[in-house]
Amino acid sequence: MSDVTPRSRSLFQVSVAVAVIGVLAAALLNALHYVQEKAERTVMEATVRNMGKGLEIELQTRVIRGRPGSSRELVGANPIQWLESPPEGYVGSCGRERAPGEWCFDVASHEVVYRPRLTASLEFRTAGRRELRWRVGSADETAGGQGANPMATGAIGLVSTTSFVWH
């Protein structure tokens, strides 16, 4: 005779079902975290791209108004001013500590700062960094900083001052 009772068979089936559900839940949570990080990266990249486009519009506006020489005044400016509305999490001038998901403008370094919420796929090339930074600068002053600079000599653009890779 078999020692397996209907009750022990039922407990075994429930145990297997719970284990399968646990594995599936873990996989789904991992996938959700991955998607959330990719969404954060996409929003951050769109915000930076929009700041760059806003700068280009400001530069062209100055040319149209006959003031192309005044473009140099934009070096070190806060590019958030050229967005229709500030990004979610923008707090103005940077404080001492920055919360994850916070954007601010560092008045001392003239850089826009973003502290990512999720960083599992983000690799900072400088040890101890936890934030991303950009600056309105000229090709002349930034050429030595981050490797190959796509801007023409004397051109003004939005450049990253943080060396990072977001996989």
PLM regions with names:
Residues P79-H167:
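Intrinsically disordered, low-complexity regions enriched in Pro/Ser/Thr/Gly and acidic residues
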Residues K38-R65:
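Membrane-proximal N-terminal amphipathic helix
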Residues M1-Q36:
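N-terminal single-pass transmembrane signal-anchor helix
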